[in-house]
């Protein structure tokens, strides 16, 4: 019996194979079949909207061209291409929410995500899902789709780059009201933790803020701050009083390209026309 025990697991003080004998030791390749050791493949983006096709083909190179003509963005890959790797995201809060059903309480997770490039573009996404990872992934996509331009200005003399909000602005959501006041250069962002992070992502360096209402409700606090930043482009100041020269919409400018069905190469269309 003693010899058999030695064969199986060595001496009594040693560790035998136990239940982990199949894996080939710690740190070895795990899993079996097709999925073991395969690198994740990147999905190739196939645009389904006119705007997506124009962006992928390089007809639109700046995100300001989209804002100028108020074109709706339906694909988050458009923002990824135009803004690029400078776009950062941060989870502001993940909170459980419940719904009463016949079977009992159904719990889901709500994620608040802020994205921005710290250069005048910021977005907010809110998503509810059964799993935390799914909620975060969905909120990031919604935040990218809601990216808006933020107008920046000066406190006094127009020296250097814009560093603060152009004027006093107020945003509201629920009972929460956020007010922003221009600040002199070097003042920094005088704000609570939640709006401070949003303002950093928007690229504002100096601002005074005040808030009132139930700021403990983080969701409304973030939305009020985002609403405040959106309103920076909601009015005309003297520098915008000049006569506007209207330009063609990208859809009008690139009509010939958009008439070609997606998936058909331009060279094939040219050959067909020459045959006719």
Curated annotation (Swiss-Prot):
Biased composition (Gly residues): 16-28
GO cellular component, one term: cytosolic small ribosomal subunit
Residue ranges constituting the S5 DRBM domain according to the UniProt record: 87-150
Signal peptide: none
GO molecular function annotation: mRNA binding; structural constituent of ribosome
UniProt keyword list: Ribonucleoprotein, Ribosomal protein
Top-rank taxon, per record: Eukaryota
Family: Belongs to the universal ribosomal protein uS5 family.
Annotated stretches, region: Disordered: 1-42
Protein name: Small ribosomal subunit protein uS5w
Gene3D superfamilies: 3.30.160.20, 3.30.230.10
Listed InterPro entries: Ribosomal_Su5_D2-typ_SF (IPR020568), Ribosomal_uS5 (IPR000851), Ribosomal_uS5_C (IPR005324), Ribosomal_uS5_euk/arc (IPR005711), Ribosomal_uS5_N (IPR013810), Ribosomal_uS5_N_CS (IPR018192), Ribsml_uS5_D2-typ_fold_subgr (IPR014721)
Stored Pfam families: Ribosomal_S5 (PF00333), Ribosomal_S5_C (PF03719)
UniProt source species: Arabidopsis thaliana (Mouse-ear cress)
